Curated annotation (Swiss-Prot):
SUPFAM superfamilies recorded: beta and beta-prime subunits of DNA dependent RNA-polymerase
InterPro entries: DNA-dir_RpoC_beta_prime, DNA-dir_RpoC_beta_prime_bact, RNA_pol_asu, RNA_pol_N, RNA_pol_Rpb1_1, RNA_pol_Rpb1_3, RNA_pol_Rpb1_3_sf, RNA_pol_Rpb1_4
Role summary: DNA-dependent RNA polymerase catalyzes the transcription of DNA into RNA using the four ribonucleoside triphosphates as substrates.
Keywords associated with the record: DNA-directed RNA polymerase, Magnesium, Metal-binding, Nucleotidyltransferase, Transcription, Transferase, Zinc
Keyword check for Nucleotidyltransferase: yes
Domain of life: Bacteria
Catalytic activity: RNA(n) + a ribonucleoside 5'-triphosphate = RNA(n+1) + diphosphate
Pfam families from the UniProt entry: RNA_pol_Rpb1_1 (PF04997), RNA_pol_Rpb1_2 (PF00623), RNA_pol_Rpb1_3 (PF04983), RNA_pol_Rpb1_4 (PF05000), RNA_pol_Rpb1_5 (PF04998)
Binding site for Zn(2+) 2: C812, C887, C894, C897
SMART domains for this protein: RPOLA_N
Cofactor: Mg(2+); Zn(2+)
Membrane spanning stretches: none
Official protein name in the record: DNA-directed RNA polymerase subunit beta'
């Protein structure tokens, strides 16, 4: 793009010495000749008297270099002048001691030893090359059995195993020289060396082509992949067996003297010593011609010692050290949180940093932080020294340091000067999202605590109860520039996850502002006065001043003589030529509001303030918004102080109706108990009805209390109401507990206790009530601790899977899109369309409905908030947008598919790390999610409103409903899925309305999904008016309703097997209940048209737990109840919520009690029972195609015979398996399902996350495809490959005239997707380190260092943000031109790129 000359390459090479990294298996020659500086022959470490390294031992100076700089071992050569000389007496080279960190040695082994990684890591590499099982290999390697290497003249087979007895037999029969059989590493070495990989590869490919069995093909493909890895790489299989072992440099396994003459040593030294001891002993034994049994045992012990060195505990019992602790092997050095990758390469300690406790700094500006003087002196010491030297105050560093320690006056002057314009970074752990590190201008302060601006606390999640923060100093000019331009606090006032302001006033500030902006409480006309009218704002302020309100010396709210003015008095004032009715408080507030926003004349709870800040940013930009935020903070604190709002016990006013409501509730509970005693309802129903009564009481008392405290007394607000309504502290639920009742409590197992706590904290709890409430408090604390760890681990997995998703291009040019609509629950709109489409790119032109001339948004436009409003107001249901799910960028994603950067409202820039932002946005609110699974039994699982009331006038239309007219003339719903719509009355026929609704040609005003048993009070096509009851919902039972007249016959309702008669203890009434059974019975009620039971008209399956309401041979009419299934009888489902549900979704796990879903469109039918499973058939009546589902009898069906189902619709209760959605409905449906399900969890907790973040994670989960037919490509059957690789391979094959491969998409959980990344460095640093490295080494993988993680590990600049390739080139280009053009303009031709 820009001309890159030699100078550029030189600059590049300084910054990055290499741009790829290859890993392979080291051969003996490499270990011996390239890496090693000498052979270690002795196990000794250091001499016990002199403490000097022993010659030829593990710390030998001759091999590894001197222990002191420029000094040989014997002391003959000292000082730098002898540099490079090798001492003729002790053989040590005179050089720096740091070479002891890089020089390696080796141990020459007496016999070949198998590397445990290649043999024990699944799948076993050696096993796959040789075609032998792991157990066979183990017996050979550990000297238990012989293996035939060359059968010679015998009838043995190659690779046949022989035990001692068989071996002796063969020797006796054929003679010792007629065949070759060996044991141990030597045998494996010979077998690997003799393996012809090329012919093996050809043979495997032939077998794969001929094999039909799927299982066998998968097995062959896996082996083929390993063999191909060896063939295509420069590795020889015999290198997996070692003839010499490399020894780590001594300074990486140090021996440190402790006080008292003892030493602390690295475990590696012990492990190496064991290897050397056994190796030396084996060499000695071999020289002495010792008996075979002893030699064999010694060889096995050497193999085990090397195993322990490489991976202790992988084979047999781990080798223990002092205190019975397993020794840390080389593998452990890499693995886990404290391994090399995560401890040292990804998590380094930072110099020029400090930490201290934080306190609030209300006097600071938004971009400032208070830095203690002592801390600043220490952190900026090098800068101070340089400045002091430049000034000529000192000449040496030592004298400058002394001057700083003395605290000379000029030092403080210099420090003040240096700190100006030098930003520092503040960080609070845990850093859950990018707002956890921000840059500030330091202000020097006395004391030892760091001062923080109150408005940035929300971003850091900081409070001042002892929290600590770390300070980091950016040193280089580039780092300072980045901190200033990108990381300053004013640039981070919006959440990257949702675009909502994060820097909003809270607590006292909110209270102060709310108090100032409160509705008028003092009306002059009520006190015999007149409303005061002011000519302008200045006059209002003068009046306030006269009343002492703006004078800090006087603290009376209102001058009693009447000269002054009440802060909440109703007044009139002329503003911008208009007379406005307002209060002095609001006039005071509007002084700080930017003019463009107009006069704010309403109360200001925290939500309103947040909206105002967002509006301010959109209208007047960042700078004015930051000034406004600072003014808000100051005004809020001042007014909160002046208002002096404090809460007293009397402010908690208990509603007078409490006793009446409680009495009524006790009466209702008694009625329910009586119904149970009379046998009308079951125990489950009684429980759920009782709980619903108390829930209702709790809600109505809570509302009554809120109304009570919102009343003003003597024109003053209730302070408690001010605190809650402003959003400063507390909520309705806490208020309910203070002044109404505590309500229902849960047992430790999550079940709800029936009798609620009817006392509140104002009245005080009884001992019993207190003891019940203590469960919840303890559970909360225990949950929080577990939640934090789980949430952190989820974030880590998410970051790992998405870390290489960066914005790599402006526009990928795709034509693909997704369709998006508002999210509704019943008739309620949970998330309007405008919120979902803001900041996304339109995929096709959007016109005003019915008016093609009015274009609302053009294809390729990024939707602004104004456009989003327009589209939503136009009544458009759904629109097509670009998405990262459909982006076709080769690497990363493109800016157009991503849309706006929510943190600043501009189109996302190139190199932006959107993957990590997405992971942080999902992970950061993790701690707010609940950990528990909800135990929702009975009522809570269904809608809790017993009736449906319409809010508008129109015509009622049934859609997808099967109904029957009951005995009372109302319509009863027979199917599980359907809805009733209220549409605008346009005088059309019912058929027309239905047709228009089905084709989405008209919008319904309201939609109510209805389920089985709902009683609809209005007929299909009848008119309804606002406020009319249109349906009743049966809360406590799922009814099974008869839809045809006839006579009852029980089928498979066999007493004692499938049913039981239960005598109600209290009433003596007998109830027939269907029980769970394991027989071949299929309980159902059949309806025959005649009393002779000859003509069958319908059957009804009766689930277990149902109570039968009709008797045999009874005559029934349509709409009659045949049986009822109490909702409490449906086994209490544990609804997995919160964090576990998010983890389940992103890990693509199969839910425990998974639902069955329809594989085709069709009609449901049953075919009896087979092996305790009900056979459900879905038949497509057009094609005649059938799909069978075997459903366990214990599962609850949610469809009936004759129901029409769509592909992907649920047939039974439970959660859907994502993999099935992918298989049946395809990728788009799965993507939609995953995004919506994850959003559902967060929405329940009130957390706002933009869809685009979840889409990025889902994109990463669907990166791979599984090959179903390799065609003429080099891909293998069943292999999982990246889509990019798949398309590339197909393109190459098609160009050569071959047949392309076929594949199906695969859904991977995030852990599996992270491990399957192209970069082996990134995968190894995540999990399964040894397995990943073994796999990579066998195929000589190359890591091109394209992602972030691998570059951090290599110590390179990350290829994102300012390190993105394009930006780096621009930088070089500017550097190159600067020398020639100092103050000249670049001509256009020179600029062309």
């Amino acid at each position: 793009m820009f001309g890159e000359g030699s100078r550029d390459n030189a600059a590049l090479s300084k910054e990055r010495l290499f741009d790829k990294l290859e890993i392979g298996i080291a051969s003996d020659i490499t270990i011996r000749d390239k890496w090693s500086c000498g052979e270690i022959k002795k196990p000794e470490t250091i001499n016990y008297r002199t403490f000097k390294p022993e010659k030829g031992g593990l710390f030998c100076e001759k091999i590894f270099g001197p222990t002191k700089d420029w000094e040989c071992c014997c002391g003959k050569y000292k000082k730098i002048k002898h540099k490079g000389i090798v001492c003729d007496r002790c053989g040590v080279e005179v050089t720096l001691s740091k070479v002891r960190r890089e020089r390696m040695a080796h141990i020459e082994l007496a016999v070949p030893i198998v590397h445990i990684w290649f043999f024990k890591t699944t799948p076993s590499r050696i096993g796959n090359v040789l075609g032998m099982t792991a157990s066979d290999l183990e017996r050979i390697i550990y000297y238990e059995e012989y293996v035939v290497i060359d059968p010679g003249k015998t009838d043995l087979n190659k690779k046949q195993l022989l035990n001692d007895a068989q071996y002796r037999e063969v020797v006796e029969k054929w003679g010792k020289d007629s065949f070759v059989a060996k044991m141990g590493g030597e045998a494996i070495y010979d077998l690997l060396k003799s393996e012809d990989l090329q012919s093996l590869l050809k043979e495997l490919k032939d077998r794969l082509r001929k094999t039909k069995s799927q299982q066998a093909r998968m097995k062959l493909a896996k082996r083929l992949k390993i063999i191909e890895g060896f063939v295509s790489s420069s590795n020889n299989p015999e290198w997996m067996v070692l003839k010499s072992i490399p020894v780590v440099p001594p300074d990486l396994r140090p021996l440190v003297p402790l006080d008292g003459g003892r030493f602390a040593t690295s475990d590696l030294n012990d492990l190496y010593r064991r290897v050397i001891n056994r190796n030396n002993r084996l060499k000695a034994i071999l020289r002495l011609k010792t008996p075979e049994v002893i030699v064999r045992n010694e060889k096995r012990m050497l193999q085990e010692a090397v195993d322990a060195l490489f991976d202790n505990g992988r084979h047999g019992h781990p080798v223990m050290g002092a205190g019975n602790r397993p020794l840390k092997s080389l593998s452990e050095m890499l693995k886990g949180k404290n391994g090399r990758f995560r401890q040292n390469l990804l998590g380094k300690r930072v110099d020029y940093s400090g930490r201290s406790v934080i306190i609030v700094g209300p006097e600071l500006k938004f971009n400032q932080c208070g830095l203690p003087k002592e801390m600043a002196l220490e952190l900026f010491e090098p800068f101070i020294i340089k400045r002091l030297k430049d000034q000529g105050s000192v000449y040496t560093i030592r004298s400058a340091k002394k001057m700083i320690q003395r605290g000379a006056p000029e030092v403080w002057d210099v420090l003040e000067e240096i700190i100006k314009g030098h930003p520092v970074l503040l960080n609070r752990a845990p850093t859950l999202h990018r707002l956890g590190i921000q840059a500030f201008e330091p202000v020097l302060i006395e004391g030892k605590a760091i001062r923080v601006h109150p408005l940035v606390c929300a971003a850091f999640n900081a409070d001042f109860d002892g929290d600590q923060m770390a300070v980091h100093v950016p040193l280089s000019i580039e780092a300072q520039l980045e901190a200033k331009v990108l990381m300053m606090a004013p640039d981070n006032i919006f959440l990257p996850s949702s675009g909502k302001p994060v820097a909003t006033p809270s607590k006292d500030m909110t209270l102060g502002i709310y108090y100032l902006m409160a509705d008028p409480t003092y009306f002059p006309e009520d006190h015999g006065g007149k409303i005061k009218i002011f000519k302008d704002v200045a006059e209002v302020l003068r009046a306030l001043y006269a009343g002492g309100f703006l004078d800090d010396r006087i603290d009376n709210r209102r001058d009693e003589t009447g000269r002054g003015i009440h802060i909440h008095e109703k007044i009139k004032v002329r503003i911008d030529g208009q007379i406005i009715e307002t209060t002095p408080g609001r006039v005071l507030f509007n002084r700080i509001v930017p003019k463009e926003l107009g006069f704010q004349n309403y109360s200001m709870p925290s939500k309103r303030i947040s909206e105002l800040i967002l509006q301010c940013y959109k209208k007047v930009g960042l700078e004015a918004t930051v000034r406004f935020l600072d003014d808000l903070k100051d005004l809020g604190f001042i007014q909160a102080t002046k208002a002096a709002i404090s809460m007293g016990l009397k402010d908690v006013r208990i509603p007078e109706i409490k006793s009446d409501i409680l009495k009524e509730a006790y009466d209702k509970v008694a009625v329910v108990k009586k119904q149970y005693d009379d046998g009308i309802i079951t125990d489950g129903e009684r429980h759920s009805k009782t709980i619903s009564i108390w829930t209702e009481v709790s809600e109505s008392l809570s509302d009554a209390l809120y109304v009570e405290i919102s009343k003003q007394t003597k024109s003053k607000h209730n302070p408690l109401y001010l605190m809650i309504d402003s959003g400063a502290r507390g909520n309705k639920s806490q208020l309910k507990q203070l002044g109404a009742l505590r309500g229902l409590m849960a047992k430790p197992n999550g079940a709800i206790i029936e009798s609620p706590i009817t006392s509140n904290f104002r009245e005080g709890l009884t001992v019993l009530e207190y003891s019940i409430s203590s469960h919840g408090a303890r559970k909360g604390l225990a949950d929080t601790a577990l939640k934090t760890a789980d949430s952190g681990y989820l974030t880590r997995r998410l970051v790992d899977v998405a870390q290489d998703v960066i914005i790599t291009e402006k526009d990928c040019g795709t034509l693909n899109h997704i369709e998006i609509s508002a999210i509704r629950q019943g008739s309620e709109e949970l998330l309007p369309l405008k919120d979902r489409i803001y900041g996304r790119t339109v995929a096709e032109d959007i016109y005003q409905p019915g008016d093609k001339s009015k274009l609302l948004a053009k294809n390729g436009d990024v939707i602004t908030s104004a456009q989003a409003e327009l589209i939503d107001d136009a009544g458009i249901e759904s629109i097509k947008i670009r998405s990262t799910l459909t982006c076709e960028s080769r690497r990363g994603v493109c800016a157009k598919c991503y849309g706006l950067n929510l943190a600043n409202g501009r189109l996302i820039g190139l190199g932006e790390a959107v993957g990590i932002i997405a992971a942080q946005s999902i992970g950061e609110p993790g701690t707010q999610l609940t950990m528990r699974t909800f135990h929702l039994g009975g009522i809570a699982a269904t809608s809790s409103t017993p009736e449906i009331v319409t809010d508008c006038d129109g015509v009622l239309v049934y859609m997808d409903l099967r109904v029957v007219v009951g005995q009372d003339g109302n319509h009863l719903v027979l199917n599980k899925k359907g809805a009733i719509h209220v549409v605008r009355d346009e005088g059309r026929s019912l058929e027309e309305y239905k047709k228009l609704l089905s084709t989405k040609s008209i919008e319904s005003l309201e939609t109510y999904p209805v389920e089985l048993g709902v009683k609809i009070l209005v007929g299909d096509g009848e008119k309804v008016s606002a406020g009319q009851r249109i349906a009743e919902v049966e809360l406590h039972n799922i009814p099974i309703i008869c839809d045809k007249p006839g006579f009852v016959k029980y089928e498979d309702l066999v007493e004692g097997i499938s049913t039981e008669k239960v005598v109600n203890k209290n009433t003596g009434l007998v109830e027939l209940i269907v029980k769970q059974h394991r027989g071949e019975l299929h309980p159902q009620i059949a309806i025959y048209s005649d009393a002779g039971l000859t003509e069958l008209v319908g059957t009804y399956a009766i689930p277990s737990g149902a109570i039968i309401s009709v008797e045999e041979n009874q005559k029934v009419d349509p709409g009659m109840l045949l049986a009822r299934l109490p909702r409490g009888a449906i086994k209490t489902k544990d609804i997995t919520g919160g964090l576990p549900r998010v983890a389940e979704l992103v890990e693509a796990r199969k839910p425990e009690d998974a639902a069955d879903i329809a594989k085709i469109d069709g009609v449901v039918d049953f075919k009896g029972i087979q092996k305790n499973k009900r056979i459900l058939v879905v038949r497509d009546e057009i094609t005649g195609m059938e799909e069978e589902h075997l459903i366990p009898l214990t599962k609850h069906l949610i469809v009936q015979r004759g129901d029409t189902v769509m592909k992907g619709q649920q047939l039974t209760d439970g959660l859907v398996v994502p993999h099935e959605i992918l298989e049946i409905c395809g990728v788009r449906e799965l993507q939609k399902y995953l995004v919506n399900e994850v959003q559902e969890v967060y929405r329940l907790q009130g957390v706002d996350i933009n869809d685009k973040h979840i889409e990025i994670i889902v994109r990463q989960m669907l990166q791979k495809v599984r090959i179903t037919d390799p065609g003429d490509t080099t891909l293998l059957f069943g292999e999982e490959v990246n889509k990019k690789e798949f398309y590339e391979e197909n393109r190459r094959t098609e160009e050569d005239g071959g047949k392309p491969a076929q594949a199906v998409p695969v859904l991977l959980g995030i852990t599996k997707a992270s491990l399957g990344t192209e970069s082996f460095i990134s995968a190894a640093s995540f999990q399964d380190t040894t397995r990943v490295l073994t796999e990579a080494a066998c195929s000589s993988k190359t890591d091109y260092l394209l992602g972030f993680k691998e570059n951090v590990i290599m110590g390179h600049m990350i290829p994102g943000g300012t390190g993105f390739d394009t930006h780096k080139r621009i930088k070089q280009y500017l550097e190159k031109e600067q020398e020639d053009l100092v103050f000249d303009f670049v001509s256009e031709s020179e600029c062309a790129c």
